[in-house]
Amino acid sequence: MYRTMMAGKLHRATVTEANLNYVGSITIDEDLLDAVGMLANEKVQIVNNNNGARLETYIIPGKRGSGVICLNGAAARLVQEGDKVIIISYQMMSDQEAKSHQPKVAVLDDQNKIEQMLGQEPAHTIL
């Protein structure tokens, strides 16, 4: 049996832009993608901490070191600049792989710089 497991997460990313007239997707700083193992065109889930909205889209790599987190197309209707979002990628794996799998979690500061890297979900609240 295969399970869908969290592979990577950008926790508390700050939306830097919402571009309604761009072809759909999310643009993410390529340094952040590398840190959590996400790839261009990969499907991701986005959770908006400000309004509870959840959506799925795909990744477009953004300029390295820019801190860009830009929701494009229709997704721009579900966020505002400054909103805090969680961006999650998933991976299918066997039960055996899942037992030892360690997702990569990056906790971001207000400028979308990595504040902390976690090997798994913390058992405490991160503000």
Curated annotation (Swiss-Prot):
The keyword Cytoplasm applies. Its cofactor is pyruvate. It is found in: Cytoplasm. It catalyses: L-aspartate + H(+) = beta-alanine + CO2. The modification Pyruvic acid (Ser) is found at S25. Its main location: cytoplasm. GO terms for molecular function: aspartate 1-decarboxylase activity. The active site is at S25, Y58. Keywords: Autocatalytic cleavage, Cytoplasm, Decarboxylase, Lyase, Pantothenate biosynthesis, Pyruvate, Schiff base, Zymogen. Is synthesized initially as an inactive proenzyme, which is activated by self-cleavage at a specific serine bond to produce a beta-subunit with a hydroxyl group at its C-terminus and an alpha-subunit with a pyruvoyl group at its N-terminus. GO terms for biological process: alanine biosynthetic process; pantothenate biosynthetic process. Pathway: Cofactor biosynthesis; (R)-pantothenate biosynthesis; beta-alanine from L-aspartate: step 1/1. It comes from the Bacteria. It is an enzyme of class 4 (lyase). Belongs to the PanD family. Catalyzes the pyruvoyl-dependent decarboxylation of aspartate to produce beta-alanine. This is Aspartate 1-decarboxylase. It comes from Bacillus velezensis (strain DSM 23117 / BGSC 10A6 / LMG 26770 / FZB42) (Bacillus amyloliquefaciens subsp. plantarum).
